[in-house]
């Protein structure tokens, strides 16, 4: 049995991920003719924050509209206001120089990170088992069976100060997805040497 916990801080403030993993494996030779194996694995992954790629306008978050890419915003947003202003004005809201610009696509990266929520949770349960039975000398039966069940939840929200909220208004969505699969295989092997 094993347990693992991983915590990563994201490239953007207010972002990162947490992952829990629990696994249990068993292997037993019941007698000379029968052996069994089994494995159960459970993962819980939570990814939070908006990240740095895309503008989130599609489900994959991989929109190629580069002017709204978060990393581009970080690199283009000016770090100081100049000698006639106060640098703290850049941290508190919009850039005063650009606040009246019609069609301005520049966004304070700190405000963007605080106003854009893209939280994803994934729970995955996998179980596999197998048995090998030696029927007679040279004749072996093997069965492998497995299942996978996954729950996925995505909560997406753009506040009124986000670049998307400023252009299109506040909006959000919640998406739940549930998937499952099952597999089995049976193999009969006869091994006779002449």
Language model features with spans:
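Transmembrane beta-strand segments that form the barrel wall of outer-membrane beta-barrel proteins
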Residues: 3-7
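Surface-exposed loop/interface segments of Gram-negative outer-membrane beta-barrel transport/assembly proteins
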Residues: 11-13, 25-124, 142-194
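Transmembrane beta-barrel architecture of outer membranes
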Residues: 17-23
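A cytosolic small-molecule/anion-sensing beta-strand core signal
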Residues: 127
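Active-site and adjacent substrate-binding regions of carbohydrate-active enzymes
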Residues: 138
């Amino acid at each position: 049995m094993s347990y693992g916990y991983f915590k990563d801080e994201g490239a953007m403030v207010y972002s990162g991920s947490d992952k829990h993993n629990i696994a249990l494996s068993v292997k037993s030779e019941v007698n000379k003719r029968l052996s069994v194996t089994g494995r159960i694995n459970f993962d819980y992954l939570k990814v939070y924050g908006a990240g740095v790629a895309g503008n989130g306008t599609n489900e994959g978050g991989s929109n190629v509209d580069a002017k709204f890419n978060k990393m581009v915003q970080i690199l283009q947003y000016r770090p100081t206001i100049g000698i006639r202003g106060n640098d703290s004005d850049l941290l508190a809201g919009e850039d005063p120089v650009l606040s009246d610009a019609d069609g301005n696509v520049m966004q304070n990266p700190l405000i963007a990170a605080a106003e854009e929520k893209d939280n994803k949770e994934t729970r995955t349960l996998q179980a596999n088992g197998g048995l090998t039975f030696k029927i007679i000398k040279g004749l072996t039966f093997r069965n492998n069976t497995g299942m996978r069940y996954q729950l996925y939840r995505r909560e997406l929200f753009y506040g009124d100060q986000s670049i998307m909220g400023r252009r299109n208004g506040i909006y959000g969505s919640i998406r739940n997805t549930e998937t499952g699969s099952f597999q089995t295989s049976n193999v009969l092997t006869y091994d006779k040497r002449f």
